Amino acid sequence: MDSAKVKISNKTISSINSGLLIFIGIYFNDTSDDINKLYNKIINLRIFEENNKFSIRDIAGEILLVSQFTLCANTKKGNRPSFKDAMEPEKAEIIFNTIVDKFKESKLKIQTGQFGAFMDVSLKNKGPMTIMLDTKI
């Protein structure tokens, strides 16, 4: 990813250059174990440069974390998504902040969106490469 930014009410609140834009959907049954699995996978995932030789740490990349409950949508029945599998907002915000704190331990540049806000998120994707990580499978 070449760059990403988050705007709220047409004002940029965070932006990064080369690195990862990570959308996080928090499910009702996510735990601290899921946080650790997610963190370890992302920090060590070798997806950068030729032949995918380097991790985000290796390239001293930047990370933009954005909470997105719509990733928890269930579309199996009907034509309207159900979000019943998403964690309730008050608890999800605590989990999201814990995830942010965990990533800050990496000493990489970490930026975030604003939890619960209506955001304009833009991305200049390279490849494109988009990977979905699920700590339950």
Question: What is the predicted function of each stretch?
Answer:
Residues 1-78, 90-137:
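N-terminal, polar/charged subdomain of small-to-medium soluble alpha/beta proteins
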Residues 78-85:
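Short hinge/gating elements
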